[in-house]
Amino acid sequence: MTLTLGHFLSLGAMLFALSVIGIFLNRKNLIVLLMAIELMLLAVNMNFVAFSYYLGDMHGQIFVFFILTVAAAESAIGLALLVLLFRNKSNINVDELNSLKG
């Protein structure tokens, strides 16, 4: 059995749907929300790689490296902010972080 473009796109769609479900079902823990957002970015990256491979164009695969770089920086900044919130509030639940409201 060979893997076709449809297999990769369906896997990417399933990963994207799983991350959306993770965002909607878990609205309490910020770390799990950050992980769900990262899973969403990885699903989109997988679709970019699949399309660029099957079209014979390297631009999609090069674009994925830029997206992964930005995602790594986003994760590092997000985790640093979560560590600061945990140090100040000793809690990272979304419901109890109402001091951030403007």
Swiss-Prot record:
Keywords of this entry: Cell inner membrane, Cell membrane, Membrane, NAD, Quinone, Translocase, Transmembrane, Transmembrane helix, Transport, Ubiquinone
Gene3D superfamilies recorded: 1.10.287.3510
EC number(s) given by UniProt: 7.1.1.-
Mode of membrane association: Multi-pass membrane protein
Locations listed in the record: Cell inner membrane
Catalysis: reaction(s): a quinone + NADH + 5 H(+)(in) = a quinol + NAD(+) + 4 H(+)(out)
GO cellular component terms, A-Z: NADH dehydrogenase complex; plasma membrane
UniProt GO molecular function: NADH:ubiquinone reductase (non-electrogenic) activity; quinone binding
Task of the protein: NDH-1 shuttles electrons from NADH, via FMN and iron-sulfur (Fe-S) centers, to quinones in the respiratory chain. The immediate electron acceptor for the enzyme in this species is believed to be ubiquinone. Couples the redox reaction to proton translocation (for every two electrons transferred, four hydrogen ions are translocated across the cytoplasmic membrane), and thus conserves the redox energy in a proton gradient.
Family of the protein in this entry: Belongs to the complex I subunit 4L family.
Complex formation: NDH-1 is composed of 14 different subunits. Subunits NuoA, H, J, K, L, M, N constitute the membrane sector of the complex.
Protein name as catalogued: NADH-quinone oxidoreductase subunit K
Lineage of source species: Bacteria, Pseudomonadati, Pseudomonadota, Betaproteobacteria, Burkholderiales
